[in-house]
A protein has these predicted regions:
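A short, Lys/Arg-rich alpha-helix, primarily the initiator
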Residues: 1-18
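Short, conserved catalytic or interaction motifs in soluble domains
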Residues: 42
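Residues that mark the N-terminal boundary/hinge immediately upstream of a DNA-recognition element
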Residues: 11, 22, 48-51
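Short alpha-helical DNA-recognition segment
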Residues: 20-39, 54
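Short, charged recognition helix plus adjacent turn
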Residues: 67-99
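DNA major-groove recognition helix of helix-turn-helix/homeodomain DNA-binding modules
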Residues: 48-65
């Protein structure tokens, strides 16, 4: 199975790499084995909301940043294969709904 990087996965890798941590160090923070955390960083496995919260606390960053990346990945996942104009229109509708 090929790597399916996501914006959240890329951010999680960057946070760990910037701090020169090993994946086993971060895996223990969220209560998973290192191979599982590695798959999360590659975008091959989903991460649970409570695990995102633990990572935000561990890295001392705003949870909203991680939630926004998670949601952006979900939108991209659903929009894959759709014409760009349809996706833009759908996002516009959501923006209006959220105002």
């Amino acid at each position: 199975m090929g790597e399916k990087t996501t914006k959240l996965a890329d951010k999680l890798y960057l946070l760990r790499a910037e701090r020169r941590l090993q994946s086993k160090d971060v895996a223990s923070v969220i209560g998973v084995e290192p191979p599982m955390y590695s798959r999360i960083e590659k975008g091959e496995r989903n991460i649970k909301p409570e695990q995102l919260q633990k990572l935000a606390e561990f890295y001392q960053i705003d949870i909203e940043e991680l939630h926004a990346l998670w949601l952006a990945d979900k939108v991209c996942e659903v929009a894959t294969g759709m014409p760009a104009e349809v996706t833009k229109k759908a996002i516009s509708i959501v923006n209006k709904e959220l105002e």
